[in-house]
């Protein structure tokens, strides 16, 4: 880990467009990328595969401490590797996503994964995608962005994303799950989903992803004095 490597944190709720924004910024700046949400999904998947009780913090903590996860950039996409296996598609199912939100609420699990996430900080810089990147994981990050959107818009985006991957989804159920997840994430005792005090807050509800990327890149370059 290089303590001097700059970090740009992108926080926000599920479906706001963080993943697309982070990939675009990482490519534009040629920086490393951390999808912290993927780490929690990988943990959720590992727990499901090993039939670990996802309601047991004691059972989950050691799995989190020794989680073998890597991110590999390949053909413009980020491959998520768990114990040598590409699980990029498997971790994006709604069941795994909902499980990830539940396991993320445990303090010991977050502590174990916190150390792992900070290990991704390397030169020339890191784009960190998550929910508490700017408030907990990288509080010293020079650039912090909080990306939001209405729950209805996020449900629509998620439905299209899942349909493109061949999954059958119900909009009302998806919207309900997103609202429930928002409530858990915003009101949990440990690292709730809130913008950092010094974050730029972007509401992408009525914005194209191209507009969001342009605003975020211009803001980051200005803050970091990048050409």
UniProtKB/Swiss-Prot annotation:
It is found in: Cytoplasm. Pfam families: Cytidylate_kin (PF02224). GO terms for molecular function: ATP binding; CMP kinase activity; dCMP kinase activity. One of its GO terms (cellular component) is cytosol. It catalyses: CMP + ATP = CDP + ADP; dCMP + ATP = dCDP + ADP. GO terms for biological process: nucleobase-containing small molecule interconversion; pyrimidine nucleotide metabolic process. Keywords: ATP-binding, Cytoplasm, Kinase, Nucleotide-binding, Transferase. ATP binds at residues 12-20. Its EC number is 2.7.4.25. It comes from the Bacteria. InterPro entries: Cytidylate_kin, Cytidylate_kinase_dom, P-loop_NTPase. It is an enzyme of class 2 (transferase). NCBIfam families: cmk. Belongs to the cytidylate kinase family. Type 1 subfamily. This is Cytidylate kinase. It comes from Erwinia tasmaniensis (strain DSM 17950 / CFBP 7177 / CIP 109463 / NCPPB 4357 / Et1/99). The lineage of its organism: Bacteria, Pseudomonadati, Pseudomonadota, Gammaproteobacteria, Enterobacterales. The gene is cmk.
């Amino acid at each position: 880990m290089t303590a001097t490597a700059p970090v740009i944190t992108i926080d926000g709720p599920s479906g706001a467009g963080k993943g697309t924004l982070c990939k675009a910024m990482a490519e534009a700046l040629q920086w490393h990328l951390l999808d912290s949400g993927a780490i929690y999904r990988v943990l959720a998947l590992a727990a499901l595969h090993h039939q670990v009780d996802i309601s047991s913090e004691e059972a989950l903590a050691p799995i989190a401490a020794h989680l073998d996860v890597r991110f590999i950039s390949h053909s413009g996409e980020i491959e998520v590797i768990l114990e040598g296996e590409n699980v990029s598609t498997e971790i994006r199912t709604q069941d795994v996503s909902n499980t990830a939100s539940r396991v993320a609420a445990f303090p010991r699990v977050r502590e174990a994964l916190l150390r792992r996430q900070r290990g991704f900080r390397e030169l020339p810089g890191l784009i960190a995608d998550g929910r508490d990147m700017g408030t907990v994981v990288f509080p010293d990050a020079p650039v912090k962005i909080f990306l939001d959107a209405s729950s209805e818009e996020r449900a629509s985006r998620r439905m299209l994303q899942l349909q493109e991957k061949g999954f059958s989804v119900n909009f009302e159920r998806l919207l309900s799950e997103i609202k429930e997840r928002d409530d858990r994430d915003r009101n949990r005792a440990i690292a709730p989903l809130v913008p950092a005090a010094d974050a730029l807050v972007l509401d992408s509800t009525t914005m194209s992803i191209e507009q969001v990327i342009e605003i975020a890149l211009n803001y980051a370059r200005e803050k970091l004095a990048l050409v």
